[in-house]
């Protein structure tokens, strides 16, 4: 698995919103527009409703435009810590009572923090939507950050970091790669935070984060499922409408400086096998120019390299030459910060990382000089569709793709229109982006140098109580 899956997963979810409709764009897009409604409350909160009446269920999500990229040095991880604290009680609820109320009606809830946002969701039978809105609106304005609860929860977060990062070689490499690839962009910091920052964090840091960013005018409410737009609007006005807007902190531009040479790092960590990852700075989709073709060409290139079992990387390096046990590619197509295009590989036994690098470069040169045939382009687009088509079967996935686009400054209204740009990608576009972006001056190479793996006692991997978010 590619160590850049965090970025890739976010990009894939967003890209899926566009690619899903490829096979039936003409007839499906207008219907989706009719089934999706948007309005804004007087306090600035945007509400988006997607009707899907196939089952009497609803996904209710609140997304805040506040993620790890908004943190300052010395307080990394506070966005994720606050996410944990959102389940630790309000003026009206005891710690843990929020989730108990959701479970009591047969629903499920959770939350997640990204570099660009923090999101909270519930999936419930449709008659319980009013109760979910009441609960979520309560903690938007009445969160109680107790000093004692914080002291316990910060220990949970630190243990989460130990288990999911410090004890996982691929996670360590990913963390170090991001820190090396980005110089001044906050994407260089891990979402979970640096351990020293967590050790020195106080409940006042979490409280300040809550006060700075958690407001209706910094949030988007997405409701998908068996609902009527008018009913959702009335409920949103009832529960979220009375919450006062806040003055949101100014977000200063944090544009990554131009890289001026290859960066290479070697990470020593307990592991069975070595691995090498190449990560190039790459453009993202800009809300101000959704028709710029390069991000779409890079997405198609990623699929050509690693979109199916017979893709170029797998066919040439794993099947034919047997140089690698695994190899994959990914590209972060969207986000508020700079993005990366990556290729990762684990060499087969007896094969060197140098040979892997040499052959990956040969594959890229071949694409740059010879291009891609029309049949391969068509096949990749078809495979992209087949891989994504089932996402719309889930009301949860529908809510996700809408919300992620909105968090990145792209209206859901343009998701299907953007598909036309995928169709426009030609072989010369792919050749151009390889030549323009996959260059050494924009490259960071991370090598995993495996160290002896220490055996752990039984139960050592057990997650601490409360590790859920």
Regions found by a protein language model. Give the residues of each.
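Non-catalytic, conformational "gating/processing" segments within enzyme and secreted inhibitor domains
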Residues: 154, 204-239, 442-443
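Bacterial N-terminal signal peptides
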Residues: 10-23
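N-terminal secretory signal peptides that target proteins for export/translocation
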Residues: 1-8
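His/Glu-based metal-binding/catalytic segments typifying zinc-dependent metallopeptidases
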Residues: 162, 179, 248-310
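Short acidic-hydrophobic surface loop/beta-edge motif
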Residues: 37-42, 265-269
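Boundary at the C-terminal end of the N-terminal hydrophobic targeting segment
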Residues: 24-28
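M16 family metallopeptidases and their MPP-like homologs
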Residues: 50, 55-81, 95-140, 169-196, ...
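Active-site His/Glu-centered metal-binding helix of metallohydrolases
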Residues: 78-86, 301
């Amino acid at each position: 698995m590619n160590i850049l899956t965090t970025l890739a997963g976010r990009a894939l979810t967003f890209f899926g919103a566009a690619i899903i409709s490829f096979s039936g764009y003409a007839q499906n897009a207008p219907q989706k527009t009719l089934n999706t409604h948007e309005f804004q409350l007087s306090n600035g909160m945007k509400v988006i409703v997607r009707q899907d009446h196939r089952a009497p269920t609803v996904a209710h999500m609140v997304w805040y435009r506040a993620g790890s990229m908004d943190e300052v040095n010395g307080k990394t991880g506070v966005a994720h810590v606050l996410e944990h604290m959102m389940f630790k009680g309000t003026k009206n609820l005891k710690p843990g009572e929020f989730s108990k109320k959701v479970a009591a009606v047969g629903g499920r809830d959770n939350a997640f923090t990204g570099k660009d946002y923090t999101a909270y969701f519930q999936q419930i039978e449709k008659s319980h939507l009013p109760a979910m809105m009441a609960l979520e609106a309560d903690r938007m304005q009445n969160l109680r950050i107790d000093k004692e609860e914080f002291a316990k929860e910060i220990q949970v977060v630190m243990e989460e970091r130990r288990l999911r990062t410090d004890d996982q070689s691929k996670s360590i490499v990913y963390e170090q790669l991001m820190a090396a690839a980005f110089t001044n962009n906050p994407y260089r910091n891990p979402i979970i935070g640096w351990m020293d920052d967590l050790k020195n964090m106080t409940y006042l840091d979490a409280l300040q984060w809550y006060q700075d960013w958690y407001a209706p005018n910094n949030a988007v409410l997405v409701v998908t499922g068996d609902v009527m737009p008018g009913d959702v609007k009335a409920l949103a006005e009832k529960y979220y409408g009375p919450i006062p807007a806040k003055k949101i902190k100014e977000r200063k531009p944090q544009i990554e400086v131009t890289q001026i040479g290859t960066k290479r790092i070697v990470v020593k960590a307990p592991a069975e096998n070595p691995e090498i990852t190449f990560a190039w700075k790459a453009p993202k989709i800009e809300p101000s120019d959704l028709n710029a073709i390069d991000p779409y060409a890079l997405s198609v290139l990623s699929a050509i390299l690693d979109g199916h079992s017979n893709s170029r990387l797998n066919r040439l390096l794993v099947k034919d030459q047997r140089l690698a046990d695994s190899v994959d590619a990914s590209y972060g197509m969207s986000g508020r910060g700079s993005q990366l295009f990556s290729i990762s590989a684990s060499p087969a036994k007896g094969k060197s990382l140098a040979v892997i690098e040499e052959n990956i470069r040969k594959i890229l040169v071949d694409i740059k000089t010879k291009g891609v045939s029309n049949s391969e382009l068509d096949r990749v687009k078809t495979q992209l569709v087949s891989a994504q088509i089932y996402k719309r079967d889930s009301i949860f996935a529908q809510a996700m793709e809408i919300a992620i686009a909105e968090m990145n400054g792209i209206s859901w209204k343009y998701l299907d229109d953007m598909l036309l740009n995928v169709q426009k990608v030609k072989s010369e576009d792919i050749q151009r982006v390889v030549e323009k972006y996959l260059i050494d001056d924009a490259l960071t190479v991370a090598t995993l140098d495996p160290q002896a793996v220490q055996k752990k006692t039984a139960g050592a991997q057990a997650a601490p109580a409360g590790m859920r978010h």
